[in-house]
Amino acid sequence: MFKTLTQNLMKIFDRLVSSGLLTEEQIDAALRDIRVALLESDVALPVIKNFVAEVKQKALGQEVIKSVSPGQMIIKIIHEEMINILSSSEDEIKLNLNAKPPVNLLMVGLQGSGKTTASGKLALCLKNQNKKVLLVSLDTYRPAAQEQLEILANSVKINSLPIVKGEKPLDIVKRAMAEAKLSAYDIVIYDTAGRTQIDQEMMNEAIAIKKIVEPTETLLVIDSMTGQDAVVTASSFNEQLEISGLILSRIDGDSKGGAALSVKYITQRPIKFLSSGEKLTDLEEFDAKRIASRILDMGDIISFVEKAASIVDREQAEKTAAKLKKGKFDLNDYLQQMKSIKKIGGFGSILSMLPGSGKIMDQIDQSKLNSKIIEHQEAIILSMTPKERRNPDIINASRRKRIALGAGTTVQKVNILLKQFKQISDMMKKASNMNPKNLLRSGLGKLFS
C-alpha cells in the first residue's frame, strides 16, 4: 500500500543521513521533497501543510542543531509527526461494545468499497472473542448482495438473518432486532446498502436505519485505492452520519497510501481496522506506530510476529529449530516453511514488514513473490520420494526429469527450486551470526533476483 511513498521517502532520508551537519536551507530542500512525495501519494493538501509545518518547527529547534546526527534526528521527528497524524487514543480505537446486548454495529460506505467483506471479517474477529454474532444485510438494491453476506457468514459458521425477498431495509432492521433479542445475540452487524456515489436519498435511508438501530459504532469502510476521493467520501459520511470510526480496505492493493494519512486527519475519527485480501482472517487492528514504521521502512516486526504466532505450528517450528542447530535442513522442512509463508500472506507480505525492505523491493522480481510460485514448489516437492526430500544431494538429472513429470512442470523449474533451497539452507546457517538487515539484503535480495 505504501510502496511508492516509502521508496520516495527513503531517497530523501538517504540524502539527509549522508550529510554531516544540516543547514536550514538543506532542511527546507528536504521538506520540499517530502511535500512532493506526499502529493504524489494522494495525501490531502491540508494534511501535507500541517505535517511539513510541524516537522520544520521541530527540526529547527535547538535539540536538532546540537545533535550529533541531525539527519537521523529529523527522520525521528518525521516518524513522530506521522504517528501524530495517524494516531487516536486507545479508547477511541477500541470497538465500543459497552451496551446491553445485543450491541449493534452499523457498517456504511460506497458500493465496491469492500464493506460486505469487511462486515464478515469483523464478525469473525468478534466470534473469535467468544461473542455470539448475527450478520444482517440491508442491501436490497444490489443483485445478490444479501446472498453474498449469507455465503460469507456460512463459510465461517456465523449466523446471518434469513433472507425474505421483497422486504424493505427498515423492515429487515425490525425483524433483526427481534431475532437478536429472542436468540440472545451479543452483537449484531448491519451491512447497509453501498452507494455508487454520495446519494442523498440513500444517505437518508442510512440516517433512518441508524436512528432505529442506535449503534454503539458506525463504521465507514473506505477503499484505500480511491486516493483523494476517499477524503471527500469520508467527510460527507461523517457530516451526515457522525461516523465513529474507519476501516481501510484493500490495503494490499497497488495504492499510493494517501488515504490512510488523510481520512483520519480530515474527519478526526479513528482508523480502527485495516482490511486486506478476500480471506476473512485478513483484518488487523490499526496501530499508528506500526503503520508509521512501515511507511518509513523501519519495518513492523511486531505485526509480523503476531501474525506468524497465530498461524505457525509451534511444535513443528521447535522441531525445525532443533534441526537447524544441528546443521540439518531438508526439503521436508523447506516445504513446511513454504506452507507457513503462504498462510502468513506470501513473501511480499513478509518483506513489507521487515526493516529495510523498501530499498531492495526494486531489486526483486515481483512476479517471484506470487503465492502461485509457492504452490508450484509444493507440487514439485510432493513429487519427490521421502528419501529425496531428506537427501536433496542425491537428486541427479534422471531424478529431476521424473520429478518434473510428476509435478507437471519443467526440469528447469525443478532446478530453480533446488537452487533456492540451497540458498535458503546456506542463509539459515549464517542467520545466527548476521545482522537482520544484512541478512535481508544478502539473502532475500539474491533469492528473488
Curated annotation (Swiss-Prot):
It is found in: Cytoplasm. It comes from the Bacteria. It catalyses: GTP + H2O = GDP + phosphate + H(+). GO terms for cellular component: signal recognition particle. Its EC number is 3.6.5.4. Pfam families: SRP54, SRP54_N, SRP_SPB. GTP binds at residues 109-116, 191-195, 249-252. Keywords: Cytoplasm, GTP-binding, Hydrolase, Nucleotide-binding, Ribonucleoprotein, RNA-binding, Signal recognition particle. Coiled coil: none annotated. One of its GO terms (molecular function) is 7S RNA binding. InterPro entries: AAA+_ATPase, P-loop_NTPase, Signal_recog_part_SRP54_M_sf, Signal_recog_particl_SRP54_hlx, Signal_recog_particle_SRP54_M, SRP, SRP/SRP_N, SRP54. One of its GO terms (biological process) is SRP-dependent cotranslational protein targeting to membrane. Part of the signal recognition particle protein translocation system, which is composed of SRP and FtsY. SRP is a ribonucleoprotein composed of Ffh and a 4.5S RNA molecule. Composed of three domains: the N-terminal N domain, which is responsible for interactions with the ribosome, the central G domain, which binds GTP, and the C-terminal M domain, which binds the RNA and the signal sequence of the RNC. Involved in targeting and insertion of nascent membrane proteins into the cytoplasmic membrane. Binds to the hydrophobic signal sequence of the ribosome-nascent chain (RNC) as it emerges from the ribosomes. The SRP-RNC complex is then targeted to the cytoplasmic membrane where it interacts with the SRP receptor FtsY. Interaction with FtsY leads to the transfer of the RNC complex to the Sec translocase for insertion into the membrane, the hydrolysis of GTP by both Ffh and FtsY, and the dissociation of the SRP-FtsY complex into the individual components. Belongs to the GTP-binding SRP family. SRP54 subfamily. This is Signal recognition particle protein. It comes from Rickettsia bellii (strain RML369-C). The gene is ffh.
